[in-house]
Amino acid sequence: MKSVRVGCVKYLNARPLIRGWPGNVEFDHPSALCQRLTKGQLEVALVSSFEFLRNPTYRIVNDVSISSDGPVYSVVVAHRGALSDVGEIELDPASETAVNLLRCLLAELGLTPRLTRGTPENTGLPRGRLIIGDQAIRFRQNHARAFQFWDLGEQWKRLTGLPFVYALWLIRPEVPDAKSIAQRLRGLRDENLAGIPAIVSDAVADVADNKQEVPREFLDRYYHKHLRFGFGTREKQGLQTFADLCGKHGMLPKRALEFGLV
């Protein structure tokens, strides 16, 4: 199999899916990876699930995702007071999946805060902030007593009873050896999940080098309790439900998903 151009989100939650990949990997934020995958600058990428909903021509690596079946911890709205009193929420532009999940949840609950990209205007309204990934983890640990945290994974589970799929391995349709790539990625996931202590040790060492303290106990709980790495029947149902709600609320055309699985 020839070398392929692989991209991956640069968050702790992706480590069990990429650690040990034998070739070069280009790490970036989800939105940047989606753009590069669309342009053909990458052939394979672990990107936001919304990218597949928007462009379902990609093939999906079956049985692999970043998902949650309840609280995810690292996709949250930080706010003070009741969420129903929040007048503005500052969005995180790094992930369209998180932004559109938030839009769906708010719409289904009948909440109508103003959603802003960038620093909100000084309107005097109570504010919230959507935070994702490692930034959300650090923010929660540094400001645990100063804010309340509306966990989008938890709210999705309450609303639908289903898991939520945040990211998928997508392969461009013209890549000839997609089945071989998918098989290697599934095998890599299985190897890493069998060795979570090594994943945790690497993560602790890396964040220590960057002067960012993330306790080992938290990481162990994060990988075992908050995250799921499969893409089975219930995850597919969750993704279809997300697509349905995005269609209902005008974020996507209404259509049934056809999963091009490899």
Language-model features: locations:
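Domain-level signature for soluble enzymes in the chorismate/prephenate branch of the shikimate pathway
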Residues: 1-262
